[in-house]
């Protein structure tokens, strides 16, 4: 199973993010834009994991998240990564020490259980669109200025499974840990 630990967004936040994606997609010649149901914030990517290790992952999540207070994040700031000449657009998360500490604790916990995890510096972001090619008159700075920050209280984290169903990428929650608050 292909697994990751994530923060899932409320329906309200997903609708707000979808409006940004919709506007961005209108400015694109091509691109693969994130479905509303797949919007999330990845905390730890595990990749392919045997189903008999799911309980270990849930144990790590409980040990490192259950006693933490809920907290608020601010979503804002358009950015992009360039990969082979194609763009991946994302919406960032403003610097948040509580979020970063949670992510670092999860990575340490997963490593203690001998999971292979990506430990590149944490750059929290929400993927809006992959393999994008934009209209020549698309002004990223102008676009970035018209989108407002989004705020959300973080009360849970989820273990997510990524799979293709009927040719579509689908994310399913396998377990949830509630934060205090």
Question: Residue ranges of each PLM-predicted region?
Answer:
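Histidine-dependent nucleotide/RNA phosphoesterase domain, centered on the 2H-phosphoesterase fold
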Residues: 1-181
